[in-house]
């Protein structure tokens, strides 16, 4: 701890200066108190060293009055002079501590102390006396730890107490109060309000240390307080009040921070008489009787109550002194029934000791006063009474009839010992806090001293700097004066020099005039020479211009000559190209003529053979069942017929190849012509632009021509690559066709039994187109994916065919047993040209009395592409004819199909029974022409007859076709059964007359001026269909007609297909009920569509317009999986 000697001399000067500033500029209400503090800190330190107790009352009264004046003034905000003031107070207070610690003089007796305490208590609050009788509890924790539970001594050792010495020094208490006020203001605690209210007012809700625990256990304003006071709520208060160092003077030297449970292990060990206090806790009461002690306590209480309204400051002190009662931990207290019996002299000692602590710790917060009043008054009653709620008169009455029981006095004394011990512990804690404050204040004082020293240093340095600045100013002023003098001298010299220079210039002006006159003469001569040279230069320039014009003329003539040469070269190239093209066209013409001749020969041969076969078939149909054929004889003929068919198919494929080669050559030549014409026009245009452009040179035109030729070369190379690819594709297809032919030949050899009667049942075969011949076959044409060119359309008009020879006579169909096989669909054609397809038109019948046979033909479709050529229509005719014998049923399908259209399925059920069954009708379809003025119509009618006497003659109808959308005509012939049936169809509904159980489904579609007929075996198995390709038009008509038959056969309606145009159906000839075994004769008129008039079909006897030869379909599915593609 610092003493007063350790303070630096500079600190007093700084403090005086700060106090003077505060007195001059601060608040006038605080100037008086600050002045008193300053006087006490500087020159009134003598009362602290006096040890007599005579002047204590006067100082105490004065200090209490000063404190009262200070308490009435609200605490201002903390300022720097106040901080210095606190340090000065602490420094003065520290001066008194060291002499008091070594001073062990005798204190007044108990009576003197009691009288002095009563005198000083006269200014206290009236109810403070009750604080001595609060029902305390014994510190059981300290007892179990071996520490003294009662800290007071016997009357013999009571003179060692230092409380009365503090009472003699009143201004010390005043300084401590001021110090506490400043410390509380520094730590943020509000100023104490002046105590003007009643002392026993109930606790306020906004009390500083009130919480849920304290309000529910201790601070109840009404009702009896509990016997065991739980003060846990006091632990939650703010920073502890910082007491001055005089609270426990004997502890100041030790200055140790102790654990919470060890506050009294070294309690005042520096005083010699305190060591034996622990042995005398349970001594008997001293010479003062219980009645006297009770009387003293009662008189003290009464005097305290009577002096209540006179000193609010004393009431603050009393309220603050009872605060440590609330700050002891609740674990150190016991119920009132567990009091330890102590002597009565301890209680008397507690009074004087408590006076000291009341006066030394008065600067506690004023809000605790109400708590102390409630806790003190509740201890004097029974546990079930609520003394805090009584009025002041009743409280005064409760103190007066206090009994003079020695046991009660002992219990009260013991309680006071407990309370004071707790208070002493709390004071010890606050003393430690004060030590920390003092250390901080010392640091602040040191800092202030440093600031003052720094200020003095600054004053010295500033004075030195001012002296230096003054010297420099004087020096600079002298320098400026010297420079002014030097400037004046320089001006004088400048004026002198100017005068001398003017004199020299005047002298040299005459020489200058002479020189100028000479220079003028030379200048005139030079001017004349310049004019001569300019005239010569103009002559040279004119000559140069003439020469340039001549050069330009010659260059232009040269460029024109070169352009003519280039133009002649280009024309020569073009003519050479034309010559080459003519040669190629001549070669193509020769090849075309040879192919046409060869094709005509083949077609003639085939037509002759087919006519013979047709005649034989008709003869066999007339004979019927009456003349059964010999199987063994027929097998050889069938094999021979199959061999002939294969040879014919090979010839037909060769003819197709020749034809398409010619087509390719023609198209290639035409394309070359078109490209050359376009190139010629572009070249002429470019040449014209170049010739008319004056700024373009020969090199630019040459570069443009070279670039154009390169582009043409690139395009030609690209076309060559395309042609090579197409040729390779054609070669691959030819090889594939050859393989198919070989496979078919092998199968035909392996299955002779199935084909023994095919020659008699084959109405038509795939042949090449017949040009304007008298007889022909049904045409089959397939339009390819690409758009046909105009040459192909013109070529289509030259091919005409006829069905007169084939269908002019009777058409006989004999029952031939065969195995049903699915009709293979034709694959889509991918080239840009139309070709003739070969399809096998074999008819297969099956042995055995089967009830129903269904022939399903899947649609064959190919995408129609090309804005020039319309969607090529085609006709698909599916005719199913079946004649029932005793043991066999025959299904015959005649189909005319084209690649881009759908081939519908035709179901032709036939009843198999012992009796003769009705015959199936044949389906006929006709195709109309598209909008490209290329029309083709084909009508085929076929019927199976059991009785030769009942022929059916259907009429083929070709419906008109719109210019854009194709039309399909469907004709369903009538078939006769055992019973007579007459059917009259209508053109609007396109129905047919069918015999007892016959159903004919016909699908007709249009193709671009191409039609074909395909005869396929009727099967019940489904046919695999290729990728679906939209067809331009399909038509299907089916109408089962009930007949008057004894044993009707089952009918099966096919799936309907939308018909774009109404079909005209005409059926002629009633059925003959009597004819059951003879063959049925079918007569079909021939058709010929005029290409010039597509809307009006024309009927002719032997001609039919068609385009391409027909293909022969293979007997197995493998024969139709691949077609000849371009």
Curated annotation (Swiss-Prot):
What is the location of the Glycyl lysine isopeptide (Lys-Gly) (interchain with G-Cter in SUMO2) cross-link? 573-574
Task: Cite the record's tissue specificity text.
Answer: Expressed in brain, skeletal muscle and placenta.
Where along the chain is composition biased (Polar residues)?
39-64, 302-320, 374-383, 833-855
Region annotation Disordered: where it falls in the sequence:
22-87, 188-252, 302-403, 745-764, 813-855, 1019-1102
**Record's GO cellular component terms:** actin filament; bicellular tight junction; COP9 signalosome; cytoplasmic vesicle; endocytic vesicle; external side of plasma membrane; glutamatergic synapse; lamellipodium
> Biased composition, Pro residues: where in the chain?
817-827, 1050-1061
Can you summarize the PTM annotation of this record? Polyubiquitinated by NEDD4, NEDD4L and ITCH, leading to proteasomal degradation.
Q: Which UniProt keywords apply?
A: Cell junction, Coiled coil, Isopeptide bond, Phosphoprotein, Tight junction, Ubl conjugation
Compartment(s): Cell junction, Tight junction
InterPro entries per UniProt = Angiomotin, Angiomotin-like, Angiomotin_C
Tell me one GO molecular function of this protein: signaling receptor activity
Q: Where is this motif: PDZ-binding?
A: 1123-1126
Cite a single GO BP annotation. Answer: establishment of cell polarity involved in ameboidal cell migration
Start-end of Low complexity biased regions: 321-336, 1030-1049
Coiled-coil stretches, from where to where? 408-668, 700-730
User: Which residues are recorded with the post-translational modification Phosphoserine?
Assistant: 693
Other facts noted in the record for this chain? 'Motus' means 'motility' in Latin.
Please quote what the entry notes about the protein's domains: The angiostatin binding domain (850-1047) allows the binding to angiostatin.
Function statement: Plays a central role in tight junction maintenance via the complex formed with ARHGAP17, which acts by regulating the uptake of polarity proteins at tight junctions. Appears to regulate endothelial cell migration and tube formation. May also play a role in the assembly of endothelial cell-cell junctions. Repressor of YAP1 and WWTR1/TAZ transcription of target genes, potentially via regulation of Hippo signaling-mediated phosphorylation of YAP1 which results in its recruitment to tight junctions.
Record-stated family: Belongs to the angiomotin family.
Q: How does it assemble?
A: Component of a complex whose core is composed of ARHGAP17, AMOT, PALS1, PATJ and PARD3/PAR3. Interacts with MAGI1 and angiostatin. Interacts with YAP1; the interaction facilitates translocation of YAP1 to the cytoplasm and tight junctions. Interacts with WWTR1/TAZ (via WW domain); the interaction facilitates translocation of WWTR1/TAZ to the cytoplasm.
Please state what the protein is called: Angiomotin
């Amino acid at each position: 701890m610092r003493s007063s000697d350790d303070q630096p001399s500079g600190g007093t000067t700084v403090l005086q200066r700060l106090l003077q500033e505060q007195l001059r500029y601060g608040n006038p209400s605080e100037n008086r108190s600050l002045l008193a503090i300053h006087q006490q800190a500087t020159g009134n330190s003598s009362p602290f060293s006096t040890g007599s107790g005579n002047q204590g009352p006067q100082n105490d009264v004065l200090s209490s009055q000063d404190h009262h004046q200070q308490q009435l003034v609200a605490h201002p905000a903390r300022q720097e002079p106040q901080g210095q003031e606190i340090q000065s107070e602490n420094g003065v207070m520290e001066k008194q501590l060291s002499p008091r610690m070594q001073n062990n003089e005798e204190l007044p007796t108990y009576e003197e102390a009691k009288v002095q305490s009563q005198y000083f208590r006269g200014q206290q609050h009236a109810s403070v006396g009750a604080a001595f009788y609060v029902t305390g509890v014994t510190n059981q924790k300290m007892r179990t730890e071996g520490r003294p539970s009662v800290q007071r001594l016997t009357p013999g050792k009571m003179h060692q107490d230092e409380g009365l010495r503090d009472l003699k020094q009143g201004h010390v208490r005043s300084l401590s109060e001021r110090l506490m006020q400043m410390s509380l203001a520094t730590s943020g605690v509000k100023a104490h309000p002046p105590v003007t209210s009643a002392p026993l007012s109930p606790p306020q809700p906004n009390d500083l240390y009130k919480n849920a625990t304290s309000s529910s256990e201790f601070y109840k304003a009404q009702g009896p307080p509990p016997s065991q006071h739980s003060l846990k709520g006091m632990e939650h208060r703010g920073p502890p009040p910082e007491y001055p160092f005089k609270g426990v003077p004997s502890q100041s030297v030790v200055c140790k921070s102790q654990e919470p449970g060890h506050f009294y292990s070294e309690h005042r060990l520096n005083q010699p008489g305190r060591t034996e206090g622990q042995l005398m806790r349970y001594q008997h009461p001293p010479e003062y009787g219980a009645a006297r002690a009770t009387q003293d306590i009662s008189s003290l209480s009464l005097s305290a109550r009577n002096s209540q309204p006179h000193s609010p400051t004393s009431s603050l002190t009393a309220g603050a002194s009872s605060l440590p009662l609330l700050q002891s931990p609740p674990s150190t207290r016991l119920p009132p029934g567990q009091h330890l019996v102590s002597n009565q002299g301890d209680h008397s000692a507690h009074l004087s000791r408590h006076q000291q602590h009341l006066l030394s710790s008065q600067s506690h917060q004023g809000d605790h006063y109400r708590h102390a009043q409630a806790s003190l008054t509740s201890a004097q009653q029974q546990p079930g009474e609520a003394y805090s709620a009584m009025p002041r008169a009743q409280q005064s009455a409760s103190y007066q009839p206090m009994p003079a029981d020695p046991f009660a006095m002992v219990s009260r004394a013991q309680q006071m010992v407990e309370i004071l011990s707790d208070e002493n512990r709390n004071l010890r804690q606050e003393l430690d806090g004060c030590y920390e404050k003092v250390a901080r204040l010392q640091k602040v004082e040191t800092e202030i001293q440093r600031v003052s020293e720094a200020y003095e240093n600054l004053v010295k340095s500033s004075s030195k700097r001012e002296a230096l600045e003054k010297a420099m100013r004087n020096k600079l002023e002298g320098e400026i004066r010297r420079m002014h003098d030097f400037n004046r001298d320089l001006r004088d010299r400048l004026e002198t020099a100017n005068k001398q220079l003017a004199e020299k210039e005047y002298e040299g002006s005459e020489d200058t005039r002479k020189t100028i006159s000479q220079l003028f003469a030379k200048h005139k001569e030079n001017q004349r020479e310049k004019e001569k040279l300019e005239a010569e230069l103009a002559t040279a320039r004119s000559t140069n211009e003439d020469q340039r014009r001549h050069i330009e003329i010659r260059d232009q003539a040269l460029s024109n000559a070169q352009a003519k040469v280039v133009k002649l070269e280009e024309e020569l190239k073009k003519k050479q190209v034309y010559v080459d093209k003519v040669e190629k066209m001549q070669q193509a013409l020769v090849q075309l003529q040879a192919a046409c001749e060869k094709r005509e020969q083949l077609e003639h041969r085939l037509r002759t053979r087919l006519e013979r076969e047709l005649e034989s078939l008709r003869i066999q149909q007339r004979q019927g069942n009456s003349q059964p054929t010999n199987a063994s004889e027929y097998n050889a003929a069938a094999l021979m017929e199959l061999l002939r068919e294969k040879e014919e198919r090979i010839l037909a494929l060769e003819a197709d190849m020749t034809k398409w080669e010619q087509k390719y050559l023609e198209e290639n030549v035409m394309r070359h012509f078109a490209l050359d014409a376009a190139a010629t026009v572009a070249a002429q245009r470019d040449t014209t632009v170049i010739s008319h452009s004056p700024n373009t040179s020969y090199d630019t035109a040459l570069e443009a021509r070279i670039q154009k030729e390169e582009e043409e070369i690139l395009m030609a190379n690209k076309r060559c690559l395309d042609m090579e690819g197409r040729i390779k594709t054609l070669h691959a297809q030819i090889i594939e066709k050859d393989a198919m032919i070989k496979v078919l030949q092998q199968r035909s050899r392996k299955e002779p039994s199935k084909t023994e009667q095919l020659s008699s049942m084959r109405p038509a075969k795939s042949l090449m187109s017949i040009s304007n011949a008298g007889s022909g076959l049904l045409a089959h044409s397939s339009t390819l994916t690409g758009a046909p060119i105009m040459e192909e359309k013109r070529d289509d008009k030259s091919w005409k065919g006829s069905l007169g020879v084939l269908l002019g006579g009777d058409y006989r169909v004999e029952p031939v047993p065969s195995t049903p096989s699915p009709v293979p669909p034709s694959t889509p054609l991918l080239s840009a040209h139309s070709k003739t397809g070969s399809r096998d038109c074999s008819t297969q019948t099956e042995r055995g009395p089967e009830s129903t046979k269904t022939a399903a033909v899947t649609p064959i479709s190919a995408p129609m592409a090309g804005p020039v050529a319309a969607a090529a229509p085609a006709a698909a005719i599916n005719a199913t004819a079946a004649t029932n014998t005793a043991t066999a049923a025959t299904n015959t399908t005649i189909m005319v199909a084209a690649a881009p259209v759908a081939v519908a399925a035709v179901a032709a059920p036939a009843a198999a029974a012992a009796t003769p069954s009705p015959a199936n009708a044949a389906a006929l379809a006709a195709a109309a022409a598209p909008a490209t003025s290329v029309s083709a119509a084909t009508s085929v009618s076929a019927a199976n007859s059991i009785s030769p006497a009942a022929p059916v003659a259907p009429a083929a109808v070709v419906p008109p076709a719109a210019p854009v959308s194709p039309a399909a005509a469907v004709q369903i012939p009538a078939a006769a059964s055992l019973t007579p049936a007459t059917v009259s169809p209508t053109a609007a509904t396109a129905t047919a007359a069918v015999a007892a159980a016959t159903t004919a489904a016909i699908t007709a579609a249009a193709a671009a001026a191409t039609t074909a007929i395909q005869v396929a075996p009727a099967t019940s198995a489904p046919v695999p269909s290729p990728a679906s390709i939209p067809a331009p038009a399909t038509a299907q008509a089916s109408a089962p007609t009930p007949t008057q038959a004894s044993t009707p056969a089952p009918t099966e309606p096919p799936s309907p297909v939308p018909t774009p145009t109404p079909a005209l159906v005409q059926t002629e000839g009633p059925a003959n009920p009597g004819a059951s075994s003879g063959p049925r004769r079918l007569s079909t008129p021939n058709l010929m569509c005029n290409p010039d008039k597509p809307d009006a079909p024309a009927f002719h006897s032997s001609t039919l317009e068609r385009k391409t030869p027909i293909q022969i379909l293979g007997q197995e599915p493998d024969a139709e999986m691949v077609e000849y593609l371009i």
